[in-house]
Amino acid sequence: MFSSGDELANQLAPRIDASEETLAAYEQQQDYQSLRAYMDGGESTEQGAAAGSGSDGPTGNEATALQQDGVTRADFPVGDAILSVLNSRGELQIGDTVYKVTRDNVYAVHVMDLSVLREKVPTLSSPPPADGDPRIVVSPVETTVPQESSEPLYNRTAAGGPRFHHVPGVGSVCDVYAGSSNRMRGESYKTFWIFYTEAGVTTEWQRKKKFLWWSYWANTYQSGTLSYSFTSTLTQGQIGLPGSYPAGPRSGSFSWTGTSRIHTTLAWGIFHRIYGEIHSHHSVSNSSVTGSCDTTA
């Protein structure tokens, strides 16, 4: 529980782009399993990837998240920092309001109505309540891809604002394939969750997996080099609590050999929106493939 958005921001700040080991250390201080850990496939290291390489099935906690909630890590287009604060139900409490982030929507209820929300939205892939319960505020996950929406009126953004559909993954993606079961994915994204907003760039190595009726791509270690370069011009508009977080013109590049994923958070905020563009170039070079692609969000 956080007493205010500023308290949440202070807790998040040291987690932004922190290592998996650092995030795990923070999570050990919490009395609940984080959403990050709940969906973790455990293949971010060479040893973890080797342990799971003999099967195309889920590894780590992926099977639980898929079977119970029908989601994978790719359904949440943000960095690991905010996922390390949410519990495994996707919930977080700020003051008297509990927010629940699912694959497609963000819900807000008074803490006294949390049991109602859990009953009507039992999983991380459940649709919004069909009865339009006034105790539950529903807003669709916003990405950078605007589309016409046919969802009920109670699934709405701010009055007069654009309507969005959730796009699994991110606002803009590109892929370089190595056969049918391995690929590099490059991502640029801006994501808005009512109480949290984030923009960033990610390059990761993925392998295709199957579980029951799901076929999905999951992050895994590879011995080659992943890299990206980016330019961005981002601004933030305050819509709630005071405070400001990094935004503005930025450019940079990053390269790492022997990893599963590289990521940069370009801007983030609590009760803020992010505007502007991100242009990024993603590359991979390993024993399977050498190639590059571009994204804009």
Where are the predicted features?
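Mature secreted bioactive peptide module from preproproteins
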Residues: 141-297
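N-terminal propeptides/leader regions of secreted preproproteins
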Residues: 1-168
